[in-house]
Amino acid sequence: MPKKPRANRPSGTTPVAPLLPKRIGAGDVVADLTRTMRAQAPEEQAQALIDQAWEARTQRQAAALARRALEIFPDCADAYNVLAGAEARSAEDALVLYEHGVDAGRRTLGNAFFDEHRGHFWGMIETRPYLRARRGLADCLWALGRKRESITHCEALLELSPDDNQGIRHG
């Protein structure tokens, strides 16, 4: 019996389809993200939400993401930073939120961390939420006329990051 003629494919080649990756749908992407979120520590999950909050189109969306981050990880300092910017209606309101952020950041990093890494904070990504909260706190204190307290926080920030990456000296 004669063989079937091949399609117009040069001899020795294989069809392309088996080499292509399997197509995935939106449902697969969501399932992968869900599995990834479950595998992350609560602190990482919360920070992922904060990363979205920084990019949110509205203050309301940013605040909702920050609140969700706090439900997952109550010591998420950046959540308080987002809320201070998104929800505070006065310097007093922002002050309270920044104080919570500073406290949360200190608990997350731990006292030994401060002693060990003093002078090198800015170079360590995990310190940035704390540094942002403390700078926000200093700015609020200054705005409220509590200059001496503000300066104390600024001096502490400069001890942690002497290169003044936050522009404390010029703020």
Regions found by a protein language model. Name each.
Residues 122-139:
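Extended HEAT/HEAT-like alpha-solenoid repeat tracts in very large eukaryotic scaffold/adaptor proteins
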